[in-house]
């Protein structure tokens, strides 16, 4: 599909390919924004507003998931037939995180990062439209009976690592990386993984300066021990979460400590887990243990993880052929019906008789060679100074540290906070990759968007909202930073795109007004003159542009009044 059409929605103006097309040339010194003709700016405001905003009634909907903060629908645009995913916020207190997530996703462009498509307006609230991923999430895939050879499992692990490496390169870390938030895409090339759900993302702390300690956020089973202990943490917390995901991939079990063995200090029980890995490649298991190290300083970076996984993938085909050759004479009887399948051996002595999750059959996923007690070729160890193994001689019972703390509610809870000023400003601070880089920005072309704020957005006719429990890119084309912005109640800033450049090239940061996030996202006092969105069929949407040269133009489209104010500075 033509990239220029991939994110466009029928009935709205097409995206422009370059900002210069409307500003009479590009460029900037990195500190100022060049301003073009008034008519160009006004036209760009229309494109920006109406190519990105849609009403809920513009789509047919099919619910595909729900969870703590949102409901997810597969939607099809009635006019164009374009299929997307709609993430509808169900918790008013999470509105600020949702707005931040949309802003952040709009600035990210990577094949393994969920692509942002636009915004849907319903009853005065904004809901994110993203690309539709057709095979659910990683947890669902691992819970299925599908045969997943090690080549597929390592490839999925690699996709997640590369996506997180890109995110960390941008100065952001996820803070809620789970198997539920890793979506699975299946096409003619097989399976691939896409990282999603950036509502709790935060700016990576600068170790060189003292900073306020970050809040405890995330999903407990995947949270790093230092986060659970309310200690200072950084992007290496994502690496621990990733290590837990690798454990899920290797053994095809849940992250719940009733399945995945943990220690009393929230670490991974390496000794117990080694009995559950079957014929896992030893290098892959070693990497998993390194990621789960209790000491954040000893965990590898995602760049290092990606390199290691690439080496493992290059060796896997030969290793798997050799394993299959050795096992061929032994595979007999009913086992041949499900080679390498899931749930082939019961975990009688490892799993309690009463499962905390009765919806799942309690069986361990093993590859074919594991059925015949094939062990890894070498012993895997990890240098973890905080590891507290269970005493096997005394048959110490399985440990669930999440049940010992009342605030963790057995791990069946999710912690979140309001976005900080630093991460909101970071949405406008992301460095662009250098010229000639096509790998990271290959997933989509950017939309031309202006530096404006929206207020009193139009609502759509009422939709019967179902109550259910969760399921869980942009690069800029401009050379210079956008003007400083501000926002009013229910205000949402459009993210100006920036020019693609090399990863190693340093570029000037974009600045914004880091006003109180609670006020700007609807939690503070409403400023005088602002209008609340209550789902009216037609309300005024005002687009303001804070630039030296301004004009005043009014447009009325489908009962919605769009206003741009401007005047020429003397």
Curated annotation (Swiss-Prot):
It catalyses: L-seryl-[protein] + ATP = O-phospho-L-seryl-[protein] + ADP + H(+); L-threonyl-[protein] + ATP = O-phospho-L-threonyl-[protein] + ADP + H(+); L-tyrosyl-[protein] + ATP = O-phospho-L-tyrosyl-[protein] + ADP + H(+). GO terms for cellular component: nuclear body; nucleus. The keyword Kinase applies. The active site is at residue 176. Its EC number is 2.7.12.1. Residues 316-327 have a biased composition (Basic and acidic residues). Keywords: ATP-binding, Kinase, Magnesium, Manganese, Metal-binding, Nucleotide-binding, Nucleus, Phosphoprotein, Serine/threonine-protein kinase, Transferase, Tyrosine-protein kinase. The modification Phosphoserine is found at residues 219, 369, 456, 460. One of its GO terms (molecular function) is metal ion binding. ATP binds at residues 64-72, 87. GO terms for biological process: actin cytoskeleton organization; focal adhesion assembly; protein phosphorylation; spermatogenesis. Residues 58-313 form the Protein kinase domain. It is found in: Nucleus. Its cofactor is Mg(2+); Mn(2+). The keyword Nucleus applies. Residues 316-357, 511-530 are annotated as: Disordered. Activated by autophosphorylation on Ser-219. PROSITE patterns: PROTEIN_KINASE_ATP (PS00107), PROTEIN_KINASE_DOM (PS50011), PROTEIN_KINASE_TYR (PS00109). PANTHER family: DUAL SPECIFICITY TESTIS-SPECIFIC PROTEIN KINASE 2, LIM DOMAIN KINASE 1. Belongs to the protein kinase superfamily. TKL Ser/Thr protein kinase family. Dual specificity protein kinase activity catalyzing autophosphorylation and phosphorylation of exogenous substrates on both serine/threonine and tyrosine residues. Phosphorylates cofilin at 'Ser-3'. May play an important role in spermatogenesis. This is Dual specificity testis-specific protein kinase 2. It comes from Mus musculus. The lineage of its organism: Eukaryota, Metazoa, Chordata, Craniata, Vertebrata.
């Amino acid at each position: 599909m033509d990239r220029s059409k991939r994110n466009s929605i029928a009935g709205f103006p097409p995206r422009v390919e370059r900002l210069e097309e409307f500003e009479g040339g590009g460029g900037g010194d990195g500190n100022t924004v060049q301003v073009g003709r008034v008519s160009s700016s006004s036209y760009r405001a229309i494109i920006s507003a109406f190519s990105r905003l849609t009403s809920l009634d513009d789509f047919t909907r099919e619910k595909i998931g729900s969870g703590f903060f949102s409901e997810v629908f597969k939607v099809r645009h009635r006019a164009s037939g374009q299929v997307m995913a709609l993430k509808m916020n169900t918790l008013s207190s999470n509105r600020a995180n949702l707005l931040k997530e949309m802003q952040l996703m709009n600035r990210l462009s990577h094949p393994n990062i969920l692509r942002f498509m636009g915004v849907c307006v319903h009853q005065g609230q904004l809901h994110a439209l993203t690309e539709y991923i057709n095979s659910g999430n990683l947890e669902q895939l691992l819970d299925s009976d599908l045969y997943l050879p090690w080549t597929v499992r390592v490839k999925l692990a690699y996709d997640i690592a590369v996506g997180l490496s890109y995110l960390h390169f941008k100065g952001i870390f996820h803070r809620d990386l789970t198997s539920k938030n890793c979506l699975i895409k299946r096409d003619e090339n097989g399976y691939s993984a896409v990282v999603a759900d950036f509502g709790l993302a935060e700016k990576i702390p600068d170790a060189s300066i003292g900073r306020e300690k970050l809040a405890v956020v995330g999903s407990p089973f995947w949270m790093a021990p230092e986060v659970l202990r309310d200690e200072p943490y950084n992007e290496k917390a994502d690496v621990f979460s990733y290590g837990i995901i690798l454990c899920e991939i290797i053994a095809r079990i849940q992250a719940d400590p009733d399945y995945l063995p943990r220690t009393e200090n929230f670490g991974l029980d390496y000794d117990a887990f080694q009995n559950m890995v079957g014929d896992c490649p030893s290098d892959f298991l070693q990497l998993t243990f390194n990621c789960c190290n209790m000491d954040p300083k000893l965990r590898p970076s995602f760049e290092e993880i990606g390199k290691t996984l690439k080496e493992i993938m290059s060796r896997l085909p030969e290793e798997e052929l050799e394993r299959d050759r050795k096992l061929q004479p032994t595979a007999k009887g009913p086992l041949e019906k499900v080679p390498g399948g899931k749930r082939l051996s019961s975990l009688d002595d490892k799993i309690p008789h009463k499962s905390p999750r009765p919806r799942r059959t309690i069986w361990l996923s093993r590859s074919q060679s594991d059925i015949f007690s094939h062990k890894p070729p070498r012993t895997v160890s990890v240098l973890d100074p905080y590891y507290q193994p269970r005493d096997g001689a005394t048959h110490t019972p399985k440990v669930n540290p999440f049940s010992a703390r009342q605030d963790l509610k057995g791990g069946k809870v999710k912690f979140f906070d309001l976005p900080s000023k630093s991460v909101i400003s970071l949405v406008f601070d992301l460095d662009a990759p250098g010229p000639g880089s096509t790998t990271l920005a290959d997933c989509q072309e950017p939309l031309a968007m202006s530096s404006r704020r929206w207020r009193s957005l139009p609502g759509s006719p009422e939709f019967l909202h179902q109550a259910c429990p969760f399921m869980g890119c942009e690069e800029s084309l401009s050379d210079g930073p956008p003007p400083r912005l501000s926002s009013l109640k229910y205000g949402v800033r459009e993210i100006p795109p920036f020019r693609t450049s090399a990863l190693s090239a340093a570029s000037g940061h974009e600045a914004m007004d880091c006003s109180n996030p609670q006020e700007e996202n609807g939690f503070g006092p409403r400023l005088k003159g602002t209008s609340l969105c209550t789902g009216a069929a037609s309300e005024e949407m005002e687009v303001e542009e804070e630039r030296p040269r301004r004009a005043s133009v009014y447009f009325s489209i489908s009962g919605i009044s769009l206003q741009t104010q401007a005047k020429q500075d003397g």
